[in-house]
């Protein structure tokens, strides 16, 4: 596979002077520059900021600050979505608020209009994850308080409603839209829930693999769903675990890494928390017979400093091995060869694959 | 030192004087009257001040009763400096850890590769302290720019390189003098205090240079030339000499001899033999990596200088300043001690001049030290300077002085990392640093400094997670302090907890990890996050606490569980699992859910399979010792319709007897004072009794 060759992989490490909570690519707004959204927290001033930075195409080791916005609390989850007019940013906080912002297309920066779901109106305590999508630009949010919220981002006002409230009997840690009316959540004990807004009241389907044997259980930290395979959800979590769950075969997860039950088929890339997983649209599947049961290549980053691409039954490709945790990464939708990731030791890395 | 308190100022460790005091404004939003202030240390260099007000009568409860404010002390440190410091701290983790693991590989046998590892380590650390990269040259080179523009060098880097030269770099032991020449050319700008240095003179002269028509007319020109030559900055000397106006086209005819002399000196300067393997680009001289070749070249070069010195051309040179200036340069190259002393400013500059022109073969610390002492006598009055104190300690082979200087001037990061160089440098230092000392509580000096550095790291929210690397390298106290550090982390925050557990996993502190999970479990449980509480207690396999919270959960279930709200419980029940032993009686909920579910499916007579399943679940529940007694009656009451099943009996004689026994047991238990009455209609007991009796009768008949 192409990315295995170090000559075709360019890495630019850019040290920052603040801790990076989250990092995302912004959709392309200019021919000459690329734009990056960073959620940072400054330990000196205890300030949390949202920043738009420009990345020079010819010299990707310089990030020029363009626009920045002070936040009241640290960012727990950050999502970007292209709307017909301008990109929409949603940022959730550890204090339980969600902030919606639009990016100005012309003078790249925050356009001044913002909507806030205040603390305690939707969630009490930290929001663990949000996702943008749904029927007409909706933001689904999950929290440690066991609530599932839905915010419709219209032109003017936000409309907020609670989809489910477990009253703390469970906590959710990840969420992802599957279709305009369906979404998937993940939580403690590697549990994954499938929800359908047309069938309110409870999750439609529950998955909790039989992890009790051998390795101890863990938490799902991140979920992704490929737009062409909405029946399968990809999840990453504790103990280096990356697995997929197909709702058509609800009892059997396909383990891509970690939680070593079937050590032969699933090589463990990492032994600690997998913080984020995304389908890697750049790495082409080595198996040319594309079958719908085969899992597409997956990128993951972990607490023990690994950024890697893994595929069912293949040798994983390590893109980056760092001495500190890689907390977050994002694959550029328009340019899937480019990846940005943020490191625990106050730096970001930009990887370009060829 | 804690516990040392005194009433008199004489005994105070840090004498307090009112002139030293510093006022920091405290910003809070608490309305007066303020009744109490409570002050405590927060992380790092900040204080946590709680401002508490006295509640006034007749006020609404909305008014906050107080506020906690964090006050940063020492805010005058620049932000970027802090970030820069953290970058160095992060960057030094890997080289340090790699070196430790290499040293630990074979502790007994002599590690032949160790010097190579140490120099690799030293280079990596050195590169963190800033690269002396020359800024890109301007497109049109300015001939009058004599000094190259470099990034501002740092004291730490200068100190590190000094230690690298003497302790780590064994390969270049033979050319320490030349390395010192390089060192001074990089850092001469750092050592000036009240007294000028050659570098500062050069900088001054460069600003004047633009306005000078004929440089050789200015006595300063010759001064800086000889000064630069004295410390071996040959490239600068040549560049300056070429500015001599005899090179200009309109003058070359009339000043041919003069120009010839200048150019001959230029050639001699650039051909100076150097006892070193190579030179970096742009530097001048001819390198010799062995002594005999060097001696030969040196003699020849000296011969050429002497020959030029006695040449008849000087008489033909009309320009007096040029003649005298060039002669002075020749004297320096011939090693005239008094000229050298007159042209240099700082003792270290004179020291370097001696190496270059008088004693190029100086080896051994003792001779270097004596030379340094001599130079200091010639150039007294240099104000104390941290780099010079350090150099003094190194030359005097006094490890204690080096340690003290490192610690005093450069802080705990420097000393912790420099000790690796010191121990590699000499056996004596190695013994001194590794000797266990009673006055330090049985630890050695090396460990002491690592512990101090780890403490500094622990005090910052972003660097505490690299402290374990240093603590783990401390044999005696390290693990104990690591445990304390881990226990101090707030576990309510999932990210911190997971980091904590990860560190425990890496250092095999399973017990500490389990305790953190238990604390987190109880924390979440208390804050109403029941699922998280159960999850972490399960992870910690804490049966005791699981049993305790199980009782509370049952109370909650007993009150709230209706068929509707079971949907809420679904997630938690899934989490509890069906057979996990660590659930501490909580597996009851799982079976209860199964029973309720099958009971719900029993809607009419046709659902015989569901009814059979429900009755099996009922027997399982009643047989299970973990089923709490207070649920027995509600379970039986729920299953009255199973007992009264029209078609046939669902429970046989022994099963019915079991249920009857349980009912009997329950009646006995009701007499006890701590019995909790189930929330059921008053006729529940009698209807269950009746149904059971009927069922028993039918079952006997059927058999």
What residues fall within each predicted segment?
Chain A
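Loop/turn-rich, solvent-exposed surfaces of beta-rich toroidal or solenoidal domains
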Residues: 267-314
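Conserved blade-ending motifs and adjacent loop-strand segments that build the rim/top face
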Residues: 15, 254-280, 314-334
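Blade-loop segments of beta-propeller domains
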Residues: 59-86, 115-117, 124-127
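Conserved beta-strand element within WD40/beta-propeller blades
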Residues: 35-41, 89-93, 139-143, 183-187, ...
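Canonical WD40 repeat/beta-propeller blade segments in eukaryotic WD-repeat proteins
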Residues: 18-27, 73-82, 124-132, 167-178, ...
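Blade-level signature of beta-propeller repeat domains, shared across WD40, Kelch, NHL, RCC1
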Residues: 328-354
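Beta-propeller domains
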Residues: 2-13, 30-68, 99-110
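Per-blade loop-tip surfaces of WD-repeat and WD-like beta-propellers in eukaryotic adaptors/scaffolds
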Residues: 3-4, 54-63, 86, 97-117, ...
């Amino acid at each position: 596979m192409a990315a295995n060759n170090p000559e075709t992989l360019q890495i630019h490490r850019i040290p920052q002077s603040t801790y990076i909570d989250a990092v995302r690519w912004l959709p392309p707004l200019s021919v000459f520059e690329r734009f990056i959204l960073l959620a940072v927290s400054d330990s000196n001033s205890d300030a949390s900021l949202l920043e738009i930075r420009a990345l020079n195409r010819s010299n990707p080791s310089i990030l020029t600050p363009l626009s920045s916005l002070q936040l009241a609390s640290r960012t727990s989850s950050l999502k970007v979505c292209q709307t017909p007019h301008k990109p929409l940013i949603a940022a959730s906080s550890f204090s339980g608020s969600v902030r919606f912002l639009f990016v100005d297309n012309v003078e790249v920066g925050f356009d001044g209009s913002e909507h806030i779901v205040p603390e305690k109106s939707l969630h009490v305590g930290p929001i663990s994850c949000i996702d943008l999508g749904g029927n007409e630009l909706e933001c689904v949010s999950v929290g440690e308080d066991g609530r599932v919220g839905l915010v419709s981002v219209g032109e003017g006002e936000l409309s907020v409603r609670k989809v489910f409230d477990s009253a703390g009997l469970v906590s959710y840690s990840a969420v992802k839209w599957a279709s305009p009316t369906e979404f998937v959540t993940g939580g403690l004990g590697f549990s994954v829930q499938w929800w359908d807004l047309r069938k309110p009241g409870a999750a439609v389907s529950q998955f909790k693999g039989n992890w009790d044997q051998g390795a101890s259980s863990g938490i799902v930290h991140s979920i992704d769903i490929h737009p062409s395979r909405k029946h399968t959800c990809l999840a990453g979590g504790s103990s280096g675990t990356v697995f997929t769950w197909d709702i058509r075969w609800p009892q059997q997860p396909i383990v891509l890494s970690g939680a070593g039950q079937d050590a032969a088929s699933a090589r463990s890339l990492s032994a600690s928390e997998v913080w984020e997983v995304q389908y890697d649209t750049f790495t082409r599947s080595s198996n040319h017979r594309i079958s719908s049961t085969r899992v597409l290549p997956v990128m993951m980053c972990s607490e023990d400093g690994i950024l890697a691409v893994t595929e069912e039954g293949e040798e994983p490709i390590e893109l980056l091995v760092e001495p500190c945790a890689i907390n977050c990464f994002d694959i550029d939708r328009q340019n899937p060869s480019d990846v940005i990731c943020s490191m625990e030791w106050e730096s970001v890395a930009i990887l370009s694959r060829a | 030192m804690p516990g040392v308190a005194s009433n008199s100022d004489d005994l105070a460790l840090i004498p307090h004087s009112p002139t030293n005091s510093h006022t920091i404004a405290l910003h809070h939003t608490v309305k007066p009257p303020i009744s109490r202030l409570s002050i405590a240390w927060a992380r790092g260099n900040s204080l946590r001040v709680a401002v508490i007000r006295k509640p006034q009568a007749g006020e609404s409860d909305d008014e906050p009763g107080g506020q906690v404010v964090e006050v940063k002390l020492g805010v005058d440190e620049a932000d970027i400096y802090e970030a820069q410091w953290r970058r160095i701290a992060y960057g030094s983790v890997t080289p340090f850890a790699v070196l430790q693991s290499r040293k630990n590989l074979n502790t007994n046998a002599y590690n032949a590769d160790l010097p190579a590892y140490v120099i690799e380590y030293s280079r990596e650390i050195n590169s963190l302290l800033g690269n002396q990269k020359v800024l890109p040259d301007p497109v049109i080179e300015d001939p009058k720019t004599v000094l190259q523009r470099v990034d501002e060098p740092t004291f730490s880097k200068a100190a590190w390189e000094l230690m690298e030269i003497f302790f780590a770099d064994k390969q270049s032991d033979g050319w320490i003098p030349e390395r010192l020449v390089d060192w001074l050319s990089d850092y001469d700008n750092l050592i000036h205090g009240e007294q000028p240095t050659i570098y500062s003179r050069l900088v001054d002269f460069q600003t004047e240079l633009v306005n000078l028509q004929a440089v050789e007319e200015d006595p300063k020109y010759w001064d800086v030339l000889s000064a630069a030559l004295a410390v071996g900055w040959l490239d600068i000397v040549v560049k300056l000499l070429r500015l001599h106006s005899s090179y200009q086209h309109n003058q070359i005819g009339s000043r041919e001899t003069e120009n010839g002399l200048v150019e001959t000196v230029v050639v001699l300067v650039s051909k100076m033999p150097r006892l070193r393997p190579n030179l970096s680009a742009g530097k001048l001289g001819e390198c010799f990596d062995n002594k005999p070749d060097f001696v030969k070249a040196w003699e020849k070069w000296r011969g050429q200088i002497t020959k030029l010195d006695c040449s008849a051309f000087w008489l033909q040179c009309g320009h007096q300043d040029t003649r005298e200036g060039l002669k002075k340069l020749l004297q320096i190259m011939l090693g005239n001690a008094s000229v050298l002393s007159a042209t240099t400013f700082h003792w270290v500059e004179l020291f370097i001049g001696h190496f270059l022109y008088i004693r190029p073969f100086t080896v051994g610390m003792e001779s270097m030290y004596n030379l340094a002492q001599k130079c200091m006598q010639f150039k007294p009055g240099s104000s104390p300077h941290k780099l010079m104190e350090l150099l003094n300690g190194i030359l005097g082979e006094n490890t204690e002085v080096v340690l003290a200087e490192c610690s005093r001037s450069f802080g705990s990061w420097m000393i912790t990392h420099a000790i690796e160089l010191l121990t590699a440098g000499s056996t004596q230092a190695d013994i001194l640093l590794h000797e266990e000392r009673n006055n330090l509580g049985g630890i050695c000096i090396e460990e002491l400094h690592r512990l101090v550095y780890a403490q500094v790291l622990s005090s910052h929210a972003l660097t505490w997670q690299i402290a374990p690397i240093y603590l783990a390298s401390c044999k005696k106290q390290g693990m104990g302090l690591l445990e304390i550090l881990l226990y101090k982390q707030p576990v309510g925050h999932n990210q911190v907890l997971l980091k904590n557990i990860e560190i425990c996993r890496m250092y095999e502190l399973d017990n500490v990890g389990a305790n953190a999970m238990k604390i987190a479990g109880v924390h979440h449980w208390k804050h109403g996050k029941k699922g998280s509480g159960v999850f972490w207690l399960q992870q910690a396999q804490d049966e005791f606490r699981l049993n305790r919270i199980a009782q509370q959960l049952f109370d909650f279930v007993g009150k709230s569980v209706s068929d509707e709200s079971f949907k809420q419980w679904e997630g938690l029940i899934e989490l509890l699992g069906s057979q996990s032993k660590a659930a501490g009686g909580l597996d009851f909920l799982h079976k209860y859910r199964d029973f309720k579910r099958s009971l719900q499916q029993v809607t009419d007579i046709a659902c015989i399979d569901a009814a059979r399943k429900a009755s099996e679940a009922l027997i399982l529940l009643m047989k299970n010792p973990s089923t709490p007694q207070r649920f027995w009656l509600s379970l039986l009451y729920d299953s009255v319709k199973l007992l009264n099943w029209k078609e046939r009996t669902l429970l046989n004689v022994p099963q019915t007897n079991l249920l009857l026994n349980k009912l009997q047991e329950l009646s006995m238990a009701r007499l006890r004072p701590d019995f909790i009455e189930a929330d059921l209609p008053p006729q529940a007991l009698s209807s269950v009794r009746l149904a059971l009796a009927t069922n028993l009768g039918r079952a006997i008949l059927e058999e």
